[in-house]
Amino acid sequence: AACSELADLARSLKAVLHLHVAETKMESAALEAEHGASIVRILAEHGVFGGRVLAAHCVWVDDADIAVLSDAGVAVAHCPVSNMKLGSGIAPLAAMLSAGVTLGLGTDGPASNDSLDLWEEVKMAALLARVAALDSTAVTPAQVLAMATRGAAAAVGLDDVGRLAEGFVADMIRIDLDHSTFVPVTEPSELLAHLVWAGSDRRVTDVWVAGEPVVVDGRVTNVDEDRARAEVSSRAVRLAEG
């Protein structure tokens, strides 16, 4: 009932409803044993998927569940590093892509990810999808990079970010392509492969948010990093002491 009410409220506000779905095997099995249906079908039957919904994880979903997600236009936040750290499982990424589910990459949160490194998510998403399918072509570099950009924007309901185009917000990064990591390149697909298999946040030199520089030559411009680190350490000690 609570989820249905939240879904109604989200629809009335034209907001995105975000919830975690089918993250662990134990949770999913318990719900199915009690209700005789998967959590995806339970949510669909209660009208939760009637608006803009972002479902995190979706690890323990079958083909029927994926069809429901696709038909309802539910977007999925795929968080491969968190899923590995917590031992949750491997989401059926290739199957969701094939079914046309809107997919964006996420880091979940610092308690279940630590580094919050989106480049790592890109690589891990591709690797896990390939090993799960036993197929080295199951997911391409272009597909996972799209999940980190256009797909992520679509997943959270933003229609003016995620790519460089006229009228879009100027959210951009600069990558040091002169680094040996990214050579040689004889065609564009090779560069995409280098970005996925060998890229990292260490190769990002500059970041712009809405056209404003927030990282320049590897240094954050809008936060005093030394002060932030000192404050975090101080607060951690106080919290540990109770």
Region spans (language model):
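Histidine/acidic residue-rich metal-binding segments in metalloenzymes
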Residues: A1-A75, G87-L103
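Generic beta-strand/beta-sheet core signal
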Residues: H20-A22, A56-C58, A77-C79, G106, ...
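Short, acidic/turn-prone active-site loops that include or flank metal/cofactor-
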Residues: E23, P80-M84, G109-A111
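His/Asp/Glu-enriched, well-ordered alpha-helical/loop segment
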Residues: E45-R52, A94-T181
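Short beta->alpha connector loops
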Residues: C58-V61, S82, D159
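Short, charged, surface-exposed secondary-structure boundary motifs
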Residues: K85-I90, D114-L116, V185
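Active-site microenvironment of metallo-dependent hydrolases
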Residues: A148-G242
